[in-house]
Amino acid sequence: MFLLLKPLLSLHDLSLNLLSVMFHGETLKASVDGVGINMSTMWRETRNVFIVPLFKCIVVMCLIISLLVFVESVYMNLVVLYVKLFNRKPEKVYKWEAMQEDMELGHQNYPMVLVQIPMYNEREVFELSIGAACRLTWPSDRLIVQVLDDSTDPAIMELVSMECTKWASKDININYERRENRNGYKAGALKHGMRHSYVKQCQYLAIFDADFQPEPDYLQRAIPFLIHNPEVALVQARWRFVNANTCLMTRMQEMSLNYHFMAEQQSGSTRHAFFGFNGTAGVWRMVAMEEAGGWKDRTTVEDMDLAVRVGLLGWKFIFVNDLEVKSELPSQFKAFRFQQHRWSCGPANLIRKMTMEIIHNKRVKIWKKFYVIYSFFFLRKIVVHFFTYFFYCVILPTSVFLPEVNIPNWSTIYVPSVITLLSAIATPRSFYLVIFWVLFENVMAMHRTKGTLIGLFEGGRVNEWVVTEKLGDTLNTKLLPQNGRLPKRVNLKEMMMGIYILCCACYDFAFGNAFLYLYLFMQATAFLISGVGFVGT
């Protein structure tokens, strides 16, 4: 602030001379001189007594958090290394035997499986998901496909209904279900689907979002885990992305999600038999779901809500890293921002509602409760977002104006470098994009922080649900053109952050000596590019 006032104060002599000429007096000049000196003194005292000590305290907190994040990242990757070195794949840890048809019973030894496909105005992808579900290699008399259509567009409703009729004519047991309203969004649709009488005969439930395409042998590989291990409630597959090469933004998403599955899901499954259900590409044991109370629509992360409640009952989860399901990444920046808002707001709101329930739980050991509260929720779903945004996008840039505050190199270079490398190894083919990925993740941390705050304090958008826009098979579908009108493309939050960091970079370039401007110029560019809408397709 003083630096901004200094140029103005330096002009006061000129103004005073003019005033002296006009009023022929020296008293006014002396008064204004005194005011300028007093303002300068007050600012220096405020800066030294309040601002600098407060900033130092914030930096210390950030350093502690950076160590916690570092330890968590190293721990998860050590678990992944352990799985690889000692071949601790789920097939080796849990009993698994391939499904075989009984000569006497025929298909009767196959359990009844319900496949749910929730959708909402999914014109581009509904054929892909319905077709993939109907092609699953499972006895047709032991499989029920349920299409839960919440579409509001009559034309799309008709298309989805016709697609279901087409597969029904091929002796596929498929049911097209609609409801009168969209209460509860996806959770409400799933809950409504479970009320139908034919569902009661099913033992297992497989869920696929409208853009997911399971391979034909998906059930053959997943169901045996549930059949031969009665303590297991969930088998989760990883996602494989059909449009990862569409643009740079989808490559960045692929890197983030690959790390999520490789490190977070695999370590949770290996060490604690618990992780967050990804909402799709998973198979549930119906008994476990019913025991936990089924689907609830109190948050926008009904999948995580169900997983936590089932896990607190003592059920185990299995993540199968080499069981992949094709899916689509949002390729438009607006759609991606809405998705990230939901994925950050929902968990924060859920931990607000479930903290005491987890603490008072008597069914699981204290270490598992600690893992769920600290690692699963607090560190990964809340603290990481705040830390990434405030430390790398606010604290570091602002520190150039406060040379008295020393931020050690290990916190700005060594620790983030190790964390970045550990994250990047999940997607070796994109290793050369790691710098772009870090800068983009910092930009998105701003939106995730905002979503987390809304979830924690139940702000106005806490239950906002915007269905992620899909484009279908990007190899055969023309990409939607970016809106050419600048006002509709501009994102003011990103622009403001970019301008602020750019100012900090310029100041550090002119007066600093730590070369922090090298990072600040790159981060400012990332914010500004996002701000003018040149991200995605």
Swiss-Prot record:
Main location: Golgi
Enzyme class: transferase
Record-level GO cellular component terms: Golgi membrane
Residues annotated as catalytic: D150, D303
GO molecular function: glucomannan 4-beta-mannosyltransferase activity
Chain sites annotated for binding substrate: D209, D211
Topology within the bilayer: Multi-pass membrane protein
Pfam family for this entry, one: Glyco_trans_2_3
Sequence intervals crossing the membrane: 50-70, 382-402, 418-438, 494-514, 515-535
Keywords of this entry: Cell wall biogenesis/degradation, Glycosyltransferase, Golgi apparatus, Membrane, Transferase, Transmembrane, Transmembrane helix
GO biological process: cell wall organization
Reaction(s) catalysed (UniProt annotation): GDP-mannose + (glucomannan)n = GDP + (glucomannan)n+1
Localization terms from the record: Golgi apparatus membrane
Organism domain of life: Eukaryota
EC number: 2.4.1.32
Function comment: Probable mannan synthase which consists of a 4-beta-mannosyltransferase activity on mannan using GDP-mannose. The beta-1,4-mannan product is the backbone for galactomannan synthesis by galactomannan galactosyltransferase. Galactomannan is a noncellulosic polysaccharides of plant cell wall.
Family of this protein: Belongs to the glycosyltransferase 2 family. Plant cellulose synthase-like A subfamily.
PANTHER family: GLUCOMANNAN 4-BETA-MANNOSYLTRANSFERASE 15-RELATED, GLUCOMANNAN 4-BETA-MANNOSYLTRANSFERASE 9
Protein name from the UniProt record: Probable glucomannan 4-beta-mannosyltransferase 15
